[in-house]
Amino acid sequence: MRFVRYALVLVVAFEVAVGECFLAAARPFGHAWPVAALAAVLGNVSLGVAGARALERPGGSAGPGLVWVGVALTLASGRQGSDVVVPNTGRGVALLLAGAAAAAGVVAVTVAGKNGTTPEGHLRR
C-alpha cells in the first residue's frame, strides 16, 4: 500500500512541477515577483516530507525532488524551433535554483533526522 501512496506523491510532484514552470513567466498585479520560486520551495519541501512519510523511509524524500528537477529542466530547455516554458530570466533561474535547493535541503534534513545527526537527534536516543 505504501508504494501506491508513494506513486501518488510522485504524480502530484509531476503536476506541481508543470504548474510551477508555467508560473515562472507570471506577472501578478503587473509586478515581476518570483511567485514560482516561492511555490517551488513550498511544494518541494511539503512533497519531500510527504514522500518520506508515504514510503516510510527518509530516502523517499528524494523521489519528488528528482521528478521536479527532471520536469523543470525539461521545460526550461528547448530545441531548435521549439517553445521554452521557463524563460531565461531572473525569475526562471530563481525557480530552478530555489526548487533544486529546496529538494536537496529536504532530503538532507530527513536523512539527518533519521540518523540522529540533527540537534534534536541526541534527544531521541
For each feature predicted by the language model, list its residue ranges.
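Membrane interfacial helix motifs at helix-loop boundaries and amphipathic/re-entrant anchors
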Residues: 16-38, 72-96
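Hydrophobic alpha-helical transmembrane segments
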Residues: 39-44, 97-101
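Structural motif marking the loop-to-transmembrane transition
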Residues: 3-7, 31-35, 39, 58-59
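Membrane-interfacial segments
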Residues: 23, 27-31, 55, 59, ...
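Membrane-water interface at the C-terminal end of transmembrane alpha helices
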Residues: 5, 99-125
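Alpha-helical transmembrane segments and their cytosolic membrane-interface
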Residues: 1-18
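Central hydrophobic cores of alpha-helical transmembrane segments
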Residues: 59-72
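Canonical alpha-helical transmembrane segments
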Residues: 42-56
